[in-house]
Amino acid sequence: MCDIIKIIMGKCCYDVRLPFITNYFQRTVGIMKTYGIICEYNPFHNGHIYQIEETKKQTGATHIVAIMSGNYVQRGEPALMDKFKRAEIAVKNGVDLVIEMPVQYSLANAELFARCGVMLLGALRCVDGISFGSECGSVEQLTQCANAVQEVTTPENLKPLMEQGIPFPDAVQQLVSYKYGPLVGDILNSPNNILAVEYIKSLKILGLLDKIKPFTIKREGAEHDSESHSSTIASGSYIRQLIDDGEDFSAFVPKETVDAVAEYEDKELLCWFENFERVLLYRLRTMSPQELAMTPDVGQGLENRIFQAARVATSLEDLLDKIKVKRYPMSRIKRILFNALFGIRTDDLKVPPTFGRILALNDRGAEILKMAGSLPEDKLSIPFSSSLKDFVEAGKQNKNVMRAVGMTTLSSDIYTLGSRNIRPSGMDFTGKVTFDKIEGFVSELPEDMKTTAMSGTPEEIEKMRAEREAAKAASENASEAAPSEEKTEDESND
């Protein structure tokens, strides 16, 4: 292996970086190939399983890490089931590690949603590629479109179109079509293509395009938000509608999702947008136009429209009807409402993610974390932990961390009000982090990189940590106190 490295390094074979690079190659070549997926899993369905299986089949990926929206999703709605349950289902169906997308980014536009997800993958420093679905199914075409979008999306180009009341996505598409032709512009007609373009843009902007290889799978069975479906694959939107209507959806999801939905229905814990009617109206009626103007995606006088609508609306449907305008998609308006509810400000989106919250993992997920922990830190490095208490402590020294913790806990506490049966607050400190043990699993990592993961509530994990540390300290003390074999022999001779 060292000879291979010397050949690769050429004249730089005696560079101070050589020990690290040699170590890195020895630990990774032929052992791990990690691909990331940025997702929502709302709920986890057969289309997601197809993506995971095809990613492994076509790329040779051995490990899958998911950056998953927490309790709220990018369409501006609460997730059907809480983040801990969705993460648990994911690791039982092919995902190895689930990390939470911070709420301020899960409720952001496509560009910022993608940027945060890519940043978190980059922060692990051991991710080899990113897998995403798209309607076009071609990384080459998506990359061409990403370059075009990056070039034409300037304030000077956008301003004339926006002043005509043209929505931002349509304005971007018009600019791309005008300069690069309709074939490139038409790529932006489809929602998954748009996200795919943003993933590639983010990789390029963050300087990760050479480290994290984009890989796309052509969507099968159903388009995003479509009611069309194959015999086994349907969109999340269609599945949620079936659940809401009380119809059979089992053909489109794994058993774990069927069981979880049944459990949540029985306990009346499914979360729906309509259940937030009163709390949203209450919050909006307590905000001034100036406060609303500080909310992400609010501009061009929209704060005044929201302010007036909240005072006369008698239902959530009425509120949305009074706010909506042609230039703003409904998903954007819904995101604004939840951002306002949680006090998320535009300035919050100028701060990169400050930590990575682990929601679920298995043995391979533990390998990903161990590998990440063995690599040198860089500009994207952030801490990862399953316990939010770790970040509360860090927040005492860093106001950005404390702010992020506050947004997370507040949004989770409000989420518990969104089901028919109201749950206690404190989900982020009581929710169970899943560790799914793989039967017969044997780690191929070197012995010094193996790790034993812990599962349970944050309190249980903290207790296990303390017990491990105590046992380790006791073992070390016993070792120091015990006489060596050589000394014992000398004493016996006396």
Regions of interest found by a model, annotated:
Residues K56-K57, V91, G122-A123:
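Non-catalytic positions within long, well-ordered alpha-helices that form the structural scaffold/packing
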